[in-house]
Amino acid sequence: MLLLTEAVKPALTDCSCHARSARGCYRPCATVGAIVYAFSMQLHNYFRSSASHRVRIALELKGLQYEYAAIHIARGDHKKTPYTALSADTLVPLLEVDGEKLSQSMAIIEYLDEKYPTPALLPADSVGRARVRALAQSIACDIHPINNLRIIKYLVTELKLEDAAKNAWYSHWCREGLEAFERQLAQRPASTFCHGDLPTLADCCLAPQIFNAHRFNVSVEGLPRTMAAYAACMALPAFQKAHPSNCPDFEP
């Protein structure tokens, strides 16, 4: 993650661009004197978004510098200009790179893996790639969609669910999905990460899901392979740097 340093922030006091935050100007055109601070990638994301979290992990694993553009989903920033002019689906994450606007976390990560193949986030063999994608999609396609903020908000505002019922909904589907994930891991010999001894796309998806499981007090007991892989992930600096608590827009 590439952010403007404390030393240059005072020079940006008069910056008139829209992309300001408490930590300075996060716009690729930001200038300080005669120096232009150019960013090759700009990630529009929200610290608490699982999909955004996945992409941050991938960027950190590959050692890629990027500009962090905070979009506060809970406050509805994704439904306001100027973001609506950038994102067709008004969701996060959105990666601006090489003049293109890429959406959907899984597509973004696969783009990064093709563009910057080292370290690889997918195995070299076709069966291994299929297995890693299946593990990743069991989280990104089975658990996440029915438990994301849009769904939870609808349950509360439209269906009038109380907090207890809302949390029961989240816990049920999250736990059921993690149990299925554990069974998939158990089909193969034990490994450090979800697939083998290096982190893959599956681990990029797992870590954010466990973060949210902890946040909603979902039990992770009886998931030994899953939690061992998660522990291995969180021992790596890349996963630590990408963690929501280390994001510039983090809120407790």
PLM region spans:
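Extreme N-terminal basic, low-complexity initiation segments
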Residues: 1-11
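Cysteine-centered motifs
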Residues: 15-17, 25, 29
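GST-like domain detector, emphasizing the conserved glutathione-binding G-site
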Residues: 26, 33-166
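Active-site-flanking alpha-helical
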Residues: 113, 209-210, 243
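GST-like fold's C-terminal all-alpha helical module
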Residues: 139-235
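Long hydrophobic alpha-helical segments typical of transmembrane helices together
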Residues: 226-252
